[in-house]
Amino acid sequence: MNEQSTSTTTQSITPSTGVVLLAFGKPQYYWAAYNLAFSIRKHSPNVKITVLFDDPIKALSHCHDLMQYINHIGHIALEDIYTNKKLDPGKVKVNLYKYLPYDRNLYLDVDAIAVKDIQPMIDELTQSGKDYISHCVGYHTIDKGRDFKEMQWAWADKMWAHFNLLESYVMPAINSSMQWIVKGSQAEAIYRTAKDLYFNNPIPIKDLRMKWGGGQPDELYMNVALAIHGIDPALKAYTKNDSSEGGMIHFAMQRGLSFQDITENYYLQSYYGGAGFTPRFYIDWLDRMLAADFKAIGKRHIYLISRIAQNKYADGKR
């Protein structure tokens, strides 16, 4: 009997990486996803993009050529979108983990436009070695008092008492418009805790320091979950001079940086917040830029940012 030798070759599998967008509610959010996907594809042709919709058929009827700019679409279950028949965006975002299609996910709110190649941004996030990163604008400990200036959703003493937090906890303040999520035990635990707090122990809306379109803000519960798990969500150590996370997304409440400054130092320009929150200076710039980019490929810029910005959930109009 001849002995047959076998050799086993071990191949490393490269983790999948891509951008994840959420679009639900009014058609304007489909339009926003379309514009953002188009801008990413223009600057970063090899980056994978998945858009998660409440109603993919309806969404594609509004943006019929969207599939030219994305790789995949997904469907969000209605029970993760509505509470008592009312749209609940915070609920969608605390449920985000179970919908993530990649091993390494760059989640972006759709109210932004890429102004250059985002692959270096993804590379930097990957090389950080961290499993969860968000745009971090500050930290708070309860000994600093009740006013957590960087986190407008609730007073610090209210959060510490309501959630029975330890005095030693350090709470971050994130802007969840950008989240880097590596699937695994750490990220899963963060979202599991945030969901549990959101559904089973929420601060009553009437007691919130600031309202968000009549619903619960996901950032509040993500901040508490991060504090409980002792996780710093910042890409780099936060300082007062660098709250922009190393220049990834430009958020503006007033006119400041020039267009050149933004394109040199940031990857995306956001138009977050309600109508009038982001200065018209930047809104008009984005529309001009998109109009030129669409014209270059023989198309028209149909879904104007100026119109989308008038229909944001933050105003309770969604």
Which residues does each predicted region cover?
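Active-site-proximal specificity loops/subdomain of glycosyltransferases
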Residues: 58-100
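Short, acidic, metal-binding catalytic loop of nucleotide-sugar glycosyltransferases
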Residues: 39-47
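A glycosyltransferase accessory/donor-loop signature
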Residues: 2-6, 10-17, 51, 161-318
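Short internal beta-strands
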Residues: 49-55
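GT-A fold catalytic core of metal-dependent nucleotide-sugar glycosyltransferases
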Residues: 91-146
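Conserved catalytic core of nucleotide-sugar-dependent glycosyltransferases
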Residues: 124-192
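Short amphipathic alpha-helical segment that frequently serves as the phosphate-/nucleotide-binding helix
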Residues: 30-38
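A conserved hydrophobic helix/loop-capping motif in glycosyltransferases and polysaccharide synthases
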Residues: 19-26
